[in-house]
Each structure stands twice: as C-alpha cells, then as structure tokens.
Amino acid sequence: MKISEEEVRHVAALSKLSFSESETTEFATTLSKIVDMVELLNEVDTTGIAITTTMADKKNIMRADIAEAGVDRKFLFQNVPEKENHFIKVPAILDDGGDA
C-alpha cells in the first residue's frame, strides 16, 4: 500500500508537525514499506492457531495482603543524622516550606 506525500502532510498538519519536502518524501517511502511489511502478515495461515493476547503465563501475581511487623524504630533511627519528634528531618526543598 502506497502512502502518498499528501497523506504524510495531512497527518503532519493534524499533529502540528512540519517537514521539509525531502523529509515528506522520505517519510512517505518509509511508511509505505512499513505498511507493506505489516500486510505480509495477512498472508500467514493461522488456521487452528489459538489467539495469543499475552506472552506471560501468569496474571495478577501478588503477595497475600497480610499485615506484618515493621522495622524496629530504634534500629531505623540509629543511622539517621537528624530527627525530630520521631520523624526523620530532611532539608527543605521549598523556599517557604510550601502549603503542603
């Protein structure tokens, strides 16, 4: 299937892109080759072949939603350079502290 330069210009305009004449010609040629390659897939006999929607055999693999004890606070805070009221103190990243 041949993609015309006019079609390339039309899609470029819809996408708010601009191309030179040489780029438009090159895109038309390249896109035509891509479409031709994809159309070759229509010639493949897939009779009796199951439809494949994903290559992954497993779906929705998640751990059980079970509450577990967290890390001991003393252990967590032993390497913290600055802390205040059981919080880790970090440098401000907003000038005024922000509205958060």
Swiss-Prot record:
Keyword Hydrolase on entry: no
Source domain of life: Bacteria
Keywords of this entry: ATP-binding, Ligase, Nucleotide-binding, Protein biosynthesis
GO biological process, one term: glutaminyl-tRNAGln biosynthesis via transamidation
Known EC number: 6.3.5.-
Family as reported in the entry's similarity comment: Belongs to the GatC family.
PANTHER family linked: GLUTAMYL-TRNA(GLN) AMIDOTRANSFERASE SUBUNIT C, MITOCHONDRIAL (PTHR15004:SF0)
Name of the protein: Aspartyl/glutamyl-tRNA(Asn/Gln) amidotransferase subunit C
Species of provenance: Streptococcus equi subsp. zooepidemicus (strain MGCS10565)
Lineage, highest ranks first: Bacteria, Bacillati, Bacillota, Bacilli, Lactobacillales
Gene encoding the protein: gatC
